[in-house]
Amino acid sequence: MDEIQKQLDKSDQLMQKACTHTQIEFSKIRAGRAMPDMLDGISILYYNAMTPLNQVAAITTPDARTLVIKPWERKCIQEIEKAIVNSKLGLNPQNDGEVVRIIVPPLTEERRKDLVKQAKNEAEKGKISIRNIRKDIKETFKHLQKDGASEDTIKRAEEKLQNLTDKHIHNIDNLLTHKEAEILEV
């Protein structure tokens, strides 16, 4: 049935979005080396609007442990520094009037374990999201069966849906494995 295929395609797209969201959340978990995307969640008040940091400054990494933030306008430096201090990243910015420098401290063993736990929580959220999508689509299949779709057709569709679910959960597991390795790398 055409409607069943539409639902399977829809579920695949939604599950892919859940995987992408999980990957974005993983990128926010710092892994001991300086990366510009560590600061993606930080916004500052810029001309009376909350603006992402990467839209008001150039963020570079001159070496593995240093981030340099060069704002387009000098007047933003104090605001940038304050936003970084107030973020939950545990970073200490240093302002020299021209740029804001952040030395990323090496991670302690305890902090690494906390970050792995945080990554596992994000992975679990992604898996739950995928399972909820599966549940919603299965409900749609039940309604289609009541509307006249054959039981065999619905069973085959549910098998395909389960395969999609397994594929995307496996994808999240792979992302988690890579993130754990990145975090635990000394």
Curated annotation (Swiss-Prot):
One Gene Ontology biological process: translational termination
MF-aspect GO terms: ribosomal large subunit binding
SUPFAM superfamilies the UniProt entry points to: Ribosome recycling factor, RRF (SSF55194)
GO cellular component terms given for this protein: cytoplasm
Record key words, sorted: Cytoplasm, Protein biosynthesis
Keyword Transcription regulation belongs to the record: no
The UniProt record lists the keyword Cytoplasm: yes
InterPro entries with a match to the protein in the record: Ribosome_recyc_fac, Ribosome_recyc_fac_dom, RRF_sf
Main location: cytoplasm
Subcellular location per the Swiss-Prot or TrEMBL entry: Cytoplasm
Family to which the UniProt record says this protein belongs: Belongs to the RRF family.
Protein task: Responsible for the release of ribosomes from messenger RNA at the termination of protein biosynthesis. May increase the efficiency of translation by recycling ribosomes from one round of translation to another.
Protein name: Ribosome-recycling factor
Source species: Amoebophilus asiaticus (strain 5a2)
Lineage, uppermost ranks: Bacteria, Pseudomonadati, Bacteroidota, Cytophagia, Cytophagales
